[in-house]
Amino acid sequence: MEKGRHHVNPRQGRGRGLIGSAMNPESYSTMEQVRAGVDNLDRQIVALLAQRFAHMRAAARIKQDRGAVRDEARKAEVIANAREEAEQLGLPGDVIANLWDQLVEASIGYEMDEFDRTKA
């Protein structure tokens, strides 16, 4: 097997299925299955981030004032929503809130760059 490549159970495939589709980590019996599942989820997360960043491009296009890009009230709301959703799913709220803080900051930076690029 090539370095960095893992055997994938044919029943799991390498497809880009919907989150939660046909993946049951409780049924895994090998680290190959775990790694293939994580790799699949990572691809889905990146695809979702591409959609999120497309929304940031739309926001940059719509906003007329660069100062409107950073909205601390909206940032707090987004992070609180993520924390609440995480806790409802049994995940550690603080960990998810920290991750979302980084995601929102990266999104704001991206939106500012897009604003500058398109409004220059």
Which stretches of residues belong to each language-model region?
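Domain-level signature for soluble enzymes in the chorismate/prephenate branch of the shikimate pathway
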Residues: 2, 9-120
